[in-house]
């Protein structure tokens, strides 16, 4: 695990969730937009939505990693873990190079948090320098926010839906993750996993990591019989 150059919260980000490890599928235009915002020297805003497990957090982690490697100060705020901190943690974030707010749907109906996000958004607009990336599980207008002005602000910028991966893309994503971890996932084994397991990517990646560890321990290559043995299928 690694820590970006600056985090406003005591959190660690996964060092394997980068743009290089993200299989885009039908999301090439989204990736291009994200990287364009990160390259520019002035502020930019993107709202990204998708169901849980589609890769929203991966992309925010990747954005933080890219800018922190350049020495820029970044902030990552996972609102699904907001019980760990208070809204005042957002104070001063308009001075960072990048602010990533994850899972904004989690604060719907929470007056203090909605106002804190709204105020931060306005400060970032005034600063003109901070890049802002926000994710949710639905479009801004469908978030059931209690503060109409916040819903309006979130609807201003570029809005993208993270498209789900096809089965072929999921296979490619699994093989990419395997290569980055230093081993090969045979195509027949990958297709077997897609056929027999929950196809949610987080589950597939966790299973792949489990198989990697088992393969190292047993000093065996990944084959369908070995996978059946380890996963008790």
UniProtKB/Swiss-Prot annotation:
GO terms for molecular function: ADP binding; identical protein binding. Changing residue 9 to A: Impaired in beta clamp binding and DnaA-ATP hydrolysis, very poor growth at 30 degrees Celsius. It comes from the Bacteria. Disruption phenotype: Essential, it cannot be deleted. Lethality is suppressed by deletion of the DARS (DnaA reactivating sequences) loci. Disruption in MG1655 confers cold-sensitivity with asynchronously replicating DNA, which is quickly suppressed. Increased levels of plasmid IncP-alpha RK2 in strain BL21-DE3, increased plasmid replication in vitro. Its main location: membrane. Changing residue 136 to D: No growth at 30 degrees Celsius, impaired RIDA. NCBIfam families: DnaA_homol_Hda, PRK08084.1. The active form seems to be an ADP-bound monomer; apo-Hda forms homo-multimers that do not hydrolzye DnaA-bound ATP. Forms the RIDA complex (regulatory inactivation of DnaA) of ATP-DnaA, ADP-Hda and the DNA-loaded beta sliding clamp (dnaN). Interacts with plasmid IncP-alpha RK2-encoded protein TrfA in strain B / BL21-DE3. Mediates the interactions of DNA replication initiator protein DnaA with DNA polymerase subunit beta sliding clamp (dnaN). Stimulates hydrolysis of ATP-DnaA to ADP-DnaA, rendering DnaA inactive for reinitiation, a process called regulatory inhibition of DnaA or RIDA. ADP-binding activates Hda to hydrolyze DnaA-ATP; Hda monomers bind to ADP with about 200-fold greater affinity than for ATP. RIDA function can be genetically separated from viability, suggesting this protein has another function as well. Suppresses the toxic effect of overexpressing a TrfA N-terminal 163 residue fragment. Inhibits inner membrane-associated plasmid IncP-alpha RK2 replication probably by interacting with plasmid-encoded TrfA. Belongs to the DnaA family. HdA subfamily. This is DnaA regulatory inactivator Hda. It comes from Escherichia coli (strain K12). The gene is hda.
